[in-house]
Design a protein with these regions (language model features):
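M16 family metallopeptidases and their MPP-like homologs
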Residues: 2-20, 40-161, 179-186, 256-258, ...
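Long, His/Glu/Asp-enriched segments that create or flank divalent metal/ion-associated functional microenvironments
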Residues: 3, 12, 23-25, 29-33, ...
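PPIase-associated folding chaperone regions across multiple families
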Residues: 20-31, 163-166, 171, 279
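Divalent metal-coordination and catalytic microenvironments
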Residues: 30, 88, 167, 252, ...
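Noncatalytic, helix-rich "gating/capping" subdomain that lines the substrate-entry/channel surface
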Residues: 31, 35-36, 73
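Short alpha-helical segments and helix-capping/turn motifs at coil-helix boundaries
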Residues: 38, 57, 164-170, 241, ...
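C-terminal regions of mature proteins
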Residues: 106-239, 244-248
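Mature N-terminal segment immediately following signal peptide/propeptide cleavage
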Residues: 243-259
């Protein structure tokens, strides 16, 4: 079951899209949505979350090309629409009244700059399909196609010059009292009830009169590793197949390195050790079935999943673990500049 609320606005004029003003508006709205989505995502990590999923965004209103909309959406269990929708509207109202914190903005800005920097680094590896999509959007909607060589320095300049105070003015401009559309999607079956239009409007009105408090951003300044591990040594170097290099470390680990030109801003890693679920006893069969699903929810060391995402803000790095029948596996990828962070996560 899901509920959507749309706050409609006139679309940015097509004949003015080829301006820095258009890039500035897109940046500011994107930052506001990114930070609000971060708050909503945090709420799904608690023991009894108020909804299954929730998020906000800004795009064309359905199929319209002359109207855009700031959209809030929440997915919830059957018959829990009132409470879930109330929570969504409360967080939107909180952002409208108090804005975002400086630390939230620094993380959002760091992640944004990392993404545009990565795109710029990979500009010579862009697939033809991406060019086709860009040209179609330019032809239909007059979206700019200046190219990354032009857009990248402008994007960095915009991010450097716009403070969080300016971003905090975005949500109040998008949340209006008129031109609101709400939709509900859910199963048509016995026992499932849905709120009326007036009930949804009453929820919005009640939230607006609540005495809300500002969001508190809890950030840890602790490093990923509390202490540096003792370094090992390379005891053997040899040539491998297909132009690879094989290193044998003092702890017995074999490292196979293979340089490629597929991507300019990515290092991929795959680590495997023998063992897997085959070494568990039969009494652990039920737990083993859930092992891989649960492993990714536990964060890292003393950092919860929420805290870890904040610590890794601005870094292009991902890491995952899995247990197969005969092996334990670690996989990851990162930008070359974040290689040390990836190794710390391992």
């Amino acid at each position: 079951t899901s509920v959507q609320i749309y706050y409609k606005h006139p679309a940015f004029p097509n004949n003015q899209k080829n301006t820095v003003q258009y890039m500035v508006q897109n940046y500011m709205i994107s930052m506001a949505c990114r930070m609000l989505n971060g708050r909503l995502s945090e709420m799904t990590q608690v023991a009894n979350p108020p909804f299954i999923n929730a998020g906000v965004g800004h795009s064309d209103f359905l199929l319209s090309k002359t109207t855009t909309a700031f959209t809030g959406s929440v997915t919830c269990k059957e018959n829990e629409i009132p409470s879930s929708f109330t929570t969504l509207m409360r967080e939107i109202e909180r952002a409208k009244k108090f804005g975002f914190t400086a630390s939230e903005y620094e993380r959002a800005k760091a992640n944004y700059l990392t993404s545009v920097e990565s795109a710029y680094s990979e500009r010579n590896k862009i697939k033809n399909g991406s060019y086709v999509n860009a040209y179609v959007r330019h032809f239909i909607d007059n979206e700019p196609i200046a190219g990354l060589e032009v857009e990248y320095p402008i994007a960095k300049q915009i991010a450097a010059q716009i403070p969080v105070e300016a971003i905090n003015q975005v949500i109040p401009q998008l949340i209006t009292k008129e031109n609101i559309v709400m939709t509900i999607f859910g199963p048509d079956k016995e026992g499932v009830t849905y709120p009326s239009e007036q009930e949804l409007l009453d929820i919005i009105k009640n939230v607006q009169t609540e005495e809300l408090t500002a969001y508190v951003d809890k950030v840890s300044n602790e490093p990923l590793l509390s202490e540096e591990p003792t370094g090992g040594k390379i005891v053997k170097t040899e040539k491998g197949v297909f132009g690879s290099t094989v290193l044998t470390l003092s702890n017995g680990i074999r490292v196979i390195m293979k340089p490629t030109e597929f991507k300019a801003d990515q290092i991929q890693l795959q680590a495997v050790s023998p063992g897997g679920t085959s070494v568990f006893g039969t009494e652990d069969v039920e737990q083993i079935r859930l092992l891989n699903n649960i492993a990714g929810l536990g964060g890292y060391g003393k950092f919860s999943l929420i805290e870890l995402s904040k610590v890794l803000a601005g870094k292009k790095v991902s890491m995952g673990t899995s247990v197969g029948t005969l092996t334990e596996n670690v996989s990851g990828s990162c930008s070359p500049k974040d290689f040390e962070t990836m190794m710390q996560l391992i």
